[in-house]
């Protein structure tokens, strides 16, 4: 609805807009800081995850090699026992 001068009605909270701007800037700065901390933590977790993944790949390969060696030994043992 328009006012007597043809202007649109002023929102109820428009008078506190300036107060919200200064609070909003501080809030944005705090949120930005928290997001930076979260990003840093996520980077650290990603590095740990990559390291663990590499170690698990090494362990998996080692276990494969060990299993193959045991299978070869078991396969050769009966052949060695027979004359």
UniProtKB/Swiss-Prot annotation:
Region (Disordered): 1-25
Keyword Coiled coil in annotation: yes
Chain coiled-coil ranges: 25-74
GO molecular function: molecular adaptor activity
Domain of life where this protein originates: Eukaryota
Disulphide linkage map: none
Record-level GO cellular component terms: anchoring junction; cell junction; cytoplasm; intermediate filament; kinetochore microtubule; subapical part of cell
Function: Essential for intermediate filament organization in intestinal cells, interacts with intermediate filament and regulates intestinal lumen morphology.
Designated name of the protein: Bublin coiled-coil protein
Native organism: Mus musculus (Mouse)
């Amino acid at each position: 609805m328009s006012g007597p001068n043809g202007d649109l009605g002023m929102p109820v909270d428009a008078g506190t807009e300036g107060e919200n701007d200064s609070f909003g800037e501080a809030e944005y700065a705090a949120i930005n800081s928290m997001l930076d901390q979260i990003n840093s933590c996520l980077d650290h977790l990603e590095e740990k995850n990559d390291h663990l993944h590499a170690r698990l790949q090494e362990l998996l390969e080692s276990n494969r090699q060990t299993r193959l060696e045991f299978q070869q030994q078991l396969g050769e043992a009966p052949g060695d026992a027979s004359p």
